[in-house]
Amino acid sequence: MFPPSGSTGLIPPSHFQARPLSTLPRMAPTWLSDIPLVQPPGHQDVSERRLDTQRPQVTMWERDVSSDRQEPGRRGRSWGLEGSQALSQQAEVIARQLQELRRLEEEVRLLRETSLQQKMRLEAQAMELEALARAEKAGRAEAEGLRAALAGAEVVRKNLEEGSQRELEEVQRLHQEQLSSLTQAHEEALSSLTSKAEGLEKSLSSLETRRAGEAKELAEAQREAELLRKQLSKTQEDLEAQVTLVENLRKYVGEQVPSEVHSQTWELERQKLLETMQHLQEDRDSLQATVELLQVRVQSLTHILALQEEELTRKVQPSDSLEPEFTRKCQSLLNRWREKVFALMVQLKAQELEHSDSVKQLKGQVASLQEKVTSQSQEQAILQRSLQDKAAEVEVERMGAKGLQLELSRAQEARRRWQQQTASAEEQLRLVVNAVSSSQIWLETTMAKVEEAAAQLPSLNNRLSYAVRKVHTIRGLIARKLALAQLRQESCPLPPPVADVSLELQQLREERNRLDAELQLSARLIQQEVGRAREQGEAERQQLSKVAQQLERELQQTQESLASLGLQLEVARQGQQESTEEAASLRQELTQQQELYGQALQEKVAEVETRLREQLSDTERRLNEARREHAKAVVSLRQIQRRAAQEKERSQELRRLQEEARKEEGQRLARRLQELERDKNLMLATLQQEGLLSRYKQQRLLTVLPSLLDKKKSVVSSPRPPECSASAPIAAAVPTRESIKGSLSVLLDDLQGLSEAISKEEAVCQGDNLDRCSSSNPQMSS
């Protein structure tokens, strides 16, 4: 047996196995798509209107009703003079009232002329303002956003000039149109700025997606984002300023809007005027009824006086017509009686004329008051409608403010979303930068590995050739060992036992076969690994070359896109700078226009307020004058009523006194007549007894026969008593001269005393009436 020599010098087959190349997993570059930014919503048009109106402060004043005091007349004057004085006073009052009415008409004419002048002045101002508006519009025609604002200002100016001719409602409407136009212009400017901002944001987003993580461009984009944030903050501040302006205007409109108390006061005054009109109508009806009653009483008094005159003429007519003194006294008594009655009739007629004049004056005052009440009711309706319009405008302003608040909240929400999107875009940009840097690192490592593999290929070829040479040497050694073993077997005398030798030979063969199989397997494996390594290296080299070419193309494209984006960024910066400058100029011009419009609006509102206050003060003054005239008319009417009541009482008292005097006079005359009848009867009896009566009759017939033939109708025979009618039928016809003279003288004395008493009572009543009038006039003046 041969010892297993050289077994220690063999190289195991595992040493020649091909080691797989350590390949790192390939990381494909992640390219991010463009991230669209959510654009902020556009602003909605919100029409805001002002109210300028204006709560006019009502200044009420009342003047004391001053009435001319009537000086008490002298008690010695007659009733006719007092009636003429009353008529002259009434004529003076009527003349003063006519002068006052003329003065009022002149004032109304002057007010109309001033209103026409104001209208002409306002029209001239409107034309001037229109010319200024045209000049401003022609000077700033190139600014698109400002054009709408100037158009709104033009509309506001025109509406203001038209509204100065109307009431407070037109002023408020014009103010609201101005606000709507200004808000529209501001919204258009904001929309233009937002559109520019959106364009900048789009360019920024495209820039951020294409520049693939350039730090400098990212910083510039961040600066652009900061500028946009500042612009958004500025726009938000402008919106807040507009909201504060709207709130101030709402407060101003709320202060200028007339309250419901004013309408309630107008309603109360109207109700009071209606009540006074009703009272005046009732007083007029009652006065008409009293006048009719007084006329009926005057007619009855005239009839009664006529009857009394007839009775007096019938009773007091003398039997002897040759008495001139008796007729003169009777005629004077009748004349005085008639004068008294005529004075009473003149007084009643004067009172009736005065009453008719006062009734006419009251009717005119009632008509004027009715006209004033209707005009005031119309003004009240106009004011109520204007108040309703102002309430609706305030509601519209509230809705506009709510819309602005909603728009502001939307803008804030859009700004917040934009900030979130910018933050996410920045995060994605950082991720893109990291991915690009990692891809570059991976590419560098793969290139290094490829270079290392390419560098290891010659060493692997050397190792492979060395392994082949080793295999050949091992085969030669094995063949040499086999040859030596055969020689030894041939040279050895006796081989060992066959079993041991065959066993060892079998083991050697098995080992040889195994080694041969291992060598063949290792050779095949080495060849396969070498082929695989070559293929893999070639594929990786081709792939890496493709990746390198693609990266070079992408790098070139990115450089070109970065250059174009740089140009676009410069253009966008210039456009943004121009837009910011234009926006600043527009804001400045808008603020100037707002200040000018605010000043013009305040001036117009102040002018309208002053004019309305003057009109209100004029109407209040006229109303106070009408009230004073009404109070004077009421006072004069009450005085007339009191005078009528006093005259009524005095006439009743006079009639009662006349009735009593007539009754007493009738009773006294009846008693006197009875006494005269008794005396006559006694005298006739004595004359008959003495025989003197027949002689007197003869003498009397001879003396008065011619006069009796002429004056038959004037002789009235006295009634005969029933006692002596049968005894003396002729003697009772003619009384004695002395008895008739005594009875007539007594009767005349009694009548004179009665007339003097009546005249004294009338003078006392007149003095009492004058004292009452003089005491009532200070009370009315106080």
From Swiss-Prot:
Record's compositionally biased regions (Basic and acidic residues): 62-74, 208-218
Keyword flag Nucleotidyltransferase: no
One Pfam short name: HCR
Disordered, as annotated region: 62-82, 182-218
Cell compartments where the protein resides: Cytoplasm; Nucleus
Keyword Cell cycle assigned: no
Chief subcellular location: cytoplasm
Gene Ontology annotations of biological process type: cell differentiation; protein export from nucleus
InterPro entries xrefs: HCR (IPR009800)
Name of the protein this chain belongs to: Coiled-coil alpha-helical rod protein 1
Source organism of this protein record: Pan paniscus
